[in-house]
Amino acid sequence: MHYFDTSFLAPLVREERSSTRVGRFMAGLPTGELAISRWTEVEFASLLARDVRMGAIAPDEARMVDALLEDVVLQSFIVLLPSGDDYERARHYLRNYETGLRAGDALHLAIAGNHRAKAIYSLDKTMIKAGKILGLPVSAGIRMG
């Protein structure tokens, strides 16, 4: 299973500098092995809400992007539900203070780790660094820059 955090998923449905590279990378992965979590969906909704609040996009545009994400997820992704074990593992990761993790990123890593993801993809440099410290198979998957 290949797990994706919100930073990697967002460029699939909204225009970002990494959109083309992310799309190309995703097209080369085996179907049926792509996963996100319910937390990813919540975090993405928060991203859109922040963009609306800051005036970066209109509410109607946010609704369209959100609907597009729902379609992409429905067609291509397994959606994992966080469990009590995931929260416990996330707390354990957060107690490793050298990682610099925030709660949401720790939860992504815990969910992916508990589901034995072959790869965890993120465009968040801090999360990638933390995942490597924790011995997890985290990578950007694409050239960042």
Q: Which residues are covered by each model-predicted region?
A:
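Acidic, PIN/NYN-like endoribonuclease modules and their adjacent C-terminal/linker elements
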Residues: 1, 71, 109, 114-145
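Acidic catalytic patch
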Residues: 41, 70-97
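Aromatic- and histidine-enriched alpha-helix N-cap/loop-to-helix transition segments
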Residues: 36-42, 104-107
